[in-house]
Amino acid sequence: MTTELTYVVITPYSLSKSRTGNIIARLMSLSDCDLVGIRMMRPSDEFVDEYIRRVKSLNIPKVGKALVDYIDQNLRRENILKQQNRCLFLLFEGTDAVARIYDVVGKLTTVTESEANRGTIRGTYSDYVTTPDVAVRYFEPAVLLPTNLEYAKNNLEFFAKFGFIDSGIYEECSEGETTLVILKPDNFFKHSVRPGNMIDMFSKTGLRIVGARMIRMSAAQGEEFYGFLRDVFKKKLKPKIVAQLRQGMEGLFNFQITDDEFNAMAEVINEKNALYEFSQIVKYMTGVDPKDVPLADRDKPGKHLALALLYRGPNAVETIRERLGVTDPAIAAEGTIRSDFGQNIVQNAAHASDSIENAVRERKIIGLYDDAGADCRRIIENWLKVNGGSSMHLKEAARIQGEL
């Protein structure tokens, strides 16, 4: 049993049909693998040409031509659906990850052969319809992925070198405004449908995902991202401190304490209290207490993983926040994400920018503004260094397991 790295590419058609959330939910909850990388892609013609060459060299029986034709006709910027060729690249890590992910996805089979595929992603979302003389009438694989470790290594190396050469952010795919959503760390503490189901709920807005990145906020990023909350806490929490002082000191002294005196005492405590509450939020988002982080380590990635997504479309900021719900899950409207998935005002499922200006500020802090970073490439390259690149010819990889 070895720790493996594998990938899933969600096709442009699956993205356009808002199937992304459900696909991610199944992969994360059923595979027992960790989602360690994510990136939007718009393949170039050169990338598609090489991808086709690789698939052809596998000599996959039965489904090979249909797959080649699909890649050729659907992944190019000029395609038969006349839509943006956005794909979503997902990177998974885990014990026997290639086989586990493939089991969740399912095989490429015709409608008449699909009995064994029930319950899989392809059993739900893919189509492979043929005529009586076995000509392909309609083909949609839903996702693309490797079926054995050697082919995974080979193609991961290919993606790392040629698949992530642009920004990974495609705001030109839709008119309107762009807003930032962060699915918070508690959604990733265990393998769960939560992240995927939340993405599925956001999809009901009709907005498009135009960028994505797995993030580990550093202490410095966390403090910059949430820095404004220190003043908010000082203003909002002072009345609560006054009330607690009144309650705690009631009957302690044989003299009257005035309102001004309670306010003066609260002022002394207020700064410390605001700093504590602020540190708790940063600790939750990063996994490290900023007070305990040495200066030399403040820019190092934190311990907690979160998922940052860019949504774009008309009135994106307001639309996303309406779907998310108010800060406190206890009073959030039923049917909102925070009502369904939030626990308290800190662990409230997700963050969403409250203005276009703040979306820009926050995107710059987490590194999802000019580009989506090089995380996927770095993860792949580091894994290949430890586990070795592909030493097997593509035809031999095909012989081991067959279809994609």
Task: Identify the residue ranges that each predicted region occupies.
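Non-catalytic terminal and connector segments of soluble metabolic enzymes
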Residues: 1-404
